[in-house]
């Protein structure tokens, strides 16, 4: 997994400004950080496609967009790596912001499913804005691997340290 910046109060404000307020300058910072993270990963790995972590349906409705997919777009275009969206929420999950490691794991256990008709082959990389405990990325990778999709890593804009 590669990330561009450590999660800090400033990074938190930028992520929230992008996610919740559609602040264009914040969007640019997040998508640039994801692009930089992918560039670092590409030095060591061949990547066939990017898979953004999907937002909860309620969050997508509220924001009016699929945030991570949109933030991954510039990296996809720059490196000519297609975005694929086979991950779906198979059940309702709570907002993770107030949960500890065990709470996040319990919240996400079995939460993702894969659209079986996608037929993806090759090396996939997950994309998210922030990794705090790794629970989201672990659960997404589990669902994808169960569906036969090879996940070789993940890129995020920010990394919380220590992982909570």
Model segments located where?
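Active-site-facing substrate-recognition patch
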Residues: 1-49, 56-77, 83-121, 158-164
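Structural beta-sheet core signal
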Residues: 85-86, 126, 153-156
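Short glycine/serine/threonine/alanine-rich loop segments
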Residues: 80-81, 149
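A phosphate-binding catalytic loop at a beta-strand-loop-alpha-helix junction
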Residues: 126-140
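PRPP-dependent phosphoribosyltransferase catalytic core
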Residues: 138-164
């Amino acid at each position: 997994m590669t990330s561009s910046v450590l999660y800090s109060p400033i990074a938190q404000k930028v992520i929230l400004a992008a996610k919740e307020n559609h602040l264009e300058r914040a969007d640019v910072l997040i998508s640039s950080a994801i692009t930089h993270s992918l560039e670092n990963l590409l030095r060591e790995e061949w990547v066939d496609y990017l898979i953004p972590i999907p937002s909860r349906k309620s969050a997508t409705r509220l924001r009016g967009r699929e945030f991570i997919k949109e933030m991954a777009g510039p990296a996809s275009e720059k490196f000519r790596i297609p975005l694929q969206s086979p991950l779906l929420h198979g059940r309702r999950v709570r907002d993770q912001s107030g949960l500890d490691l065990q709470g996040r794991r319990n919240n996400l256990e079995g939460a993702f499913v894969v659209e079986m008709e996608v037929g993806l082959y090759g090396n996939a990389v997950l994309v998210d804005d922030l990794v705090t405990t790794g629970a989201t990325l672990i659960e997404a990778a589990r669902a994808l691997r169960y569906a036969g999709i090879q996940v070789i890593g993940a890129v995020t804009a920010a990394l919380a340290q220590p992982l909570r």
